[in-house]
Design a protein with these regions (language model features):
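Short glycine/proline- and aromatic-enriched beta-strand/turn motifs that initiate or cap beta-hairpins
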Residues: 20-87, 247
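Extracellular/periplasm-exposed beta-strand and loop segments of Gram-negative cell-envelope proteins
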Residues: 38-63, 86-118, 147-165, 173, ...
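Repeated loop/turn-to-beta-strand initiation elements of outer-membrane beta-barrel proteins
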Residues: 77-80, 132-135, 180-184, 212-215
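Transmembrane beta-strand segments that form the barrel wall of outer-membrane beta-barrel proteins
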Residues: 181-196, 221-222
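Predominantly the C-terminal beta-signal and adjacent terminal strand-loop region
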Residues: 197-247
Length: 248
């Protein structure tokens, strides 16, 4: 699925560059930077499994990341966008206590490698609620497909838990231009329910390089998880983000 989104993004972006008309309805966005983990606690299964921390019991290595988004303005106030946001973090260390993970017992002091994957594919609808020269506020909804996995691997043991599911989210975007060149950019997808919660928030400085090109620097976090019979997992992921947005 990830390869499909990447290829589709490149094809559509290339077509926009060479075949765009004067309407300038398309926006292509590329974001990248460094990602690292805050808390990342798991117990699988929720009843009978052992609570452990991928970020405290093991060491998670920070790494580079990227995200791709393509958007199309249906009209002045209505917009659709597709987001491809892959994420895989690696952990390693020795378990400070025995861990029962998906029915596999990893003894105390076992050297393990851990994997945390949380790929996200999203379709977002935005409505322009406020449209002023220096202030734009969009609200809407996001349909998210979550492709997740937590895995532990030792020399003679291995176990993993995968999950693919649909998550409906509320969406918000705020663009506040302080000057003709510099402003604030806030974007968020979020939802909460009895079974868990999800938040993906970006707060960035927005620098207009030209009327069609924006450069962004900021902080993003992804937080949330699920507390259900099958899985307990909550994580806080931090991003140091830089991005470019091109309007065609």
């Amino acid at each position: 699925m990830g390869k499909f989104f990447l290829i589709a993004f490149l094809i559509v972006s290339s077509g926009l560059i060479w075949g765009s008309g004067p309407a300038r309805r398309w926006t292509a966005e590329v974001e990248g930077g460094a990602v690292f983990s805050g808390y990342n606690d798991a117990r699988i299964p929720n009843v009978g499994g052992t609570l452990f921390s991928l970020s405290e019991d093991l060491d998670i290595t920070a790494k580079a990341y990227y995200r791709l988004r393509i958007s199309y303005a249906l009209s002045r106030r209505h917009e659709l966008s597709l987001l491809y946001a892959p994420l895989t973090l690696k952990a390693a260390g020795r378990l400070p206590a025995a861990v029962n993970f998906t029915g596999v017992l990893f003894p105390k002091d076992t050297a393990v490698d851990g994997t945390y994957t949380f790929n996200s594919y999203r379709l977002t609808y935005r409505y322009r609620l406020v449209d002023k020269p220096r202030l734009r506020l969009d609200v809407g909804f996001t349909a998210k497909i979550r492709d997740a996995e937590i895995a532990l691997e030792a020399p003679s043991l291995s176990a993993s838990k995968t999950n693919v599911g649909f998550v409906p989210l509320l969406h918000l975007r705020l663009v506040w231009d302080w000057t003709a060149k510099l402003g604030l950019y806030l974007e968020a997808d979020a939802a909460a329910a009895k079974q868990g919660r999800a938040e993906d928030v970006l707060l960035a400085l927005n620098w207009w390089l030209s009327p069609q090109t924006q450069l962004r620097f900021g902080y993003r976090f992804v937080e949330g998880g699920a507390d259900v019979d099958e899985v307990y997992n909550f994580a806080w992921i931090h991003y140091i983000a830089a991005g470019l947005a091109f309007v065609f």
